Amino acid sequence: MEQYTTNPEEFYKSLKKNLDLNHDFPGNYLYKFILTNHDEEKLGELYQVFDDLEYSLTTKESSNGKYLSVTISCFVLDSNHVIKIYKDVSKIEGIIML
C-alpha cells in the first residue's frame, strides 16, 4: 500500500479502497498499536476508543520494557468504521499505528 505522509485524507482514501476490495464486512478487523513509553494514561485512552465495541485484546511488552504492543480484534461494520477508529486513535499522542 502506498504511504501518504503529507496528506492523511489521501492515505485514508487509499485504505478504504483496499479494505473494500480485500476485507469482508461486517466482521472482525485486527488493529495493532505500539505505545512508545508504556504510559498507562495512553493505554486507557486507547481502551476508551473501543469502549462501546465488541473486541478482544492482547498486549506484549518489549524485551527491554520500553514499548508495549497492543493487538485488538474488533467487530466492525464496514471500511468507514475501520477508518473512524484509526482516526480516533490517531488523536492519542505517542501511539504508533501499524
PLM region descriptions:
Residues 1-69, 75-98:
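Long, contiguous binding/interaction regions
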